[in-house]
Amino acid sequence: MLTPLQTYFPIAVALLVAVGLAAVMLALANVLGPRRPSEVKSTPFECGSLPVSPARERFSVKFYVVALLFIVFDIEAIFLYPWAVLLLPSDGYPGLGWAGYISMGIFVATLVAGLVYVWKKGVLDWAD
C-alpha cells in the first residue's frame, strides 16, 4: 500500500522534469542565441507598421473599470454554468431544488443591481 506521500511522487517528478526542461531551454537560448541589438529591434512592434505614439503611454481609468466589470460578469458566468447543470435532478442526483433556484436568483439580482448602479453613476458613459 502506498503512503500519501508516495502517491504524489509521479506529480513531483513531472513537475521537476517540466521545470528542468524549461530551465535548460532558457539557458541554451541565452548561451547560443545571437546578440545583435539594433535600433529596429528595439522599436515597439505595432502590427507591422511604424509606431505612431510612444509605447509607454497612460491608459484612461475607464479601461480598468471596464476590465473589472468584465471580470465580475465573467465570474458570474463561471458560477452560472455549474448551477445550471445541477439545478434539475439527473442520474440519481436530487438537484438543487427551489433553494438553489432562489439563491442563484439572489446572486444574479445582486449583480444586476450592481450593473444598474454602475450604469446610473455613468461609469459606462464614454462621451466625456
From Swiss-Prot:
The keyword Transmembrane applies. Keywords: Cell inner membrane, Cell membrane, Membrane, NAD, Quinone, Translocase, Transmembrane, Transmembrane helix, Transport, Ubiquinone. Its main location: membrane. The keyword Zinc does not apply. It comes from the Bacteria. It is found in: Cell inner membrane. It holds the Pfam family Oxidored_q4. It catalyses: a quinone + NADH + 5 H(+)(in) = a quinol + NAD(+) + 4 H(+)(out). InterPro entries: NAD(P)H_OxRDtase_bac/plastid, NADH_UbQ/plastoQ_OxRdtase_su3, NDAH_ubi_oxred_su3_sf. GO terms for cellular component: NADH dehydrogenase complex; plasma membrane. GO terms for molecular function: NADH dehydrogenase (ubiquinone) activity; NADH:ubiquinone reductase (non-electrogenic) activity; quinone binding. Its EC number is 7.1.1.-. It is a multi-pass membrane protein. The chain crosses the membrane at residues 9-29, 68-88, 96-116. Belongs to the complex I subunit 3 family. PANTHER family: NADH-QUINONE OXIDOREDUCTASE SUBUNIT A, NADH-UBIQUINONE OXIDOREDUCTASE CHAIN 3. NDH-1 is composed of 14 different subunits. Subunits NuoA, H, J, K, L, M, N constitute the membrane sector of the complex. NDH-1 shuttles electrons from NADH, via FMN and iron-sulfur (Fe-S) centers, to quinones in the respiratory chain. The immediate electron acceptor for the enzyme in this species is believed to be ubiquinone. Couples the redox reaction to proton translocation (for every two electrons transferred, four hydrogen ions are translocated across the cytoplasmic membrane), and thus conserves the redox energy in a proton gradient. This is NADH-quinone oxidoreductase subunit A. It comes from Anaeromyxobacter sp. (strain Fw109-5). The lineage of its organism: Bacteria, Pseudomonadati, Myxococcota, Myxococcia, Myxococcales.
